[in-house]
UniProtKB/Swiss-Prot annotation:
It comes from Achromobacter cycloclastes. This is Copper-containing nitrite reductase. It is found in: Periplasm. Belongs to the multicopper oxidase family. Keywords: Copper, FAD, Flavoprotein, Metal-binding, Nitrate assimilation, Oxidoreductase, Periplasm, Repeat, Signal.
Amino acid sequence: MTEQLQMTRRTMLAGAALAGAVAPLLHTAQAHAAGAAAAAGAAPVDISTLPRVKVDLVKPPFVHAHDQVAKTGPRVVEFTMTIEEKKLVIDREGTEIHAMTFNGSVPGPLMVVHENDYVELRLINPDTNTLLHNIDFHAATGALGGGALTQVNPGEETTLRFKATKPGVFVYHCAPEGMVPWHVTSGMNGAIMVLPRDGLKDEKGQPLTYDKIYYVGEQDFYVPKDEAGNYKKYETPGEAYEDAVKAMRTLTPTHIVFNGAVGALTGDHALTAAVGERVLVVHSQANRDTRPHLIGGHGDYVWATGKFRNPPDLDQETWLIPGGTAGAAFYTFRQPGVYAYVNHNLIEAFELGAAGHFKVTGEWNDDLMTSVVKPASM
């Protein structure tokens, strides 16, 4: 039996054991919830009576069309994501990994719903893949965030539904028992935004409306090296597993990047805006702390831990997003030019790749900044 098949079988067996352990707990929890609802006089929701909408997800940094304020009552929002194991080049030198992805991108797509909507996800693991996968939504309640109910082997699919009860931005990620770090640091994570039904609010409770939204997924990679210090390449994910674990245990990333690769949000792929545009940036890091900073700008309104029931912090220079969290920052651009958006651990930004650009068009405002004396010889 090859190392790859041994590893795959081990993953499947672990997943089966986990499902067996969780099932009795899940049955007990469901019975308790039903009893509590009956005692409180709350009628169970008849899902069949709710309107349904199908959403086509888009590749980050872009986000699918959505209403900022809910126009109806709660509804069932249907998504489909296909798991894709693929080779991915993560820097300009051609360093290659076996990425594990939701819908083929690192990060996976940003999903947007409103508070008290029902998220219904069809999760597909094609038979072209080699590993068991699942999904853990930090926005969900119960069954390991859905991870215990969504374990799919290659050639299988499943559908999960959960109620989005907490407004905010939240991480989701793959979480197969015993291999969670490997899957997450191979790119298998993303975010979901649960908007308040009446939209975002400032610290005084006044509406905040954005003109554009971008999703930045920060990813730490741990690429094994050979004895000469060169990055290794592997034919299959299973072949890389033991070396990948050794690299992860150093707790020292070889790359920390935005949206899957060094430079993925720079140059022709830079994020764009215009002076006066209000931009919301959702930023997630499923594994490590990060410190977003917009060089030349600020966070006018910031939810660093991403939870919209809390009033935003104002006028932030840098904000801390803990590992395993998504945050959100709202900024109105006031000057044209190129802005660097970075993780302000500057080693991680400039040496490891955690940086992107905003290209902003418009008229320069001398009142905000001007060159009084141009650089010249003394």
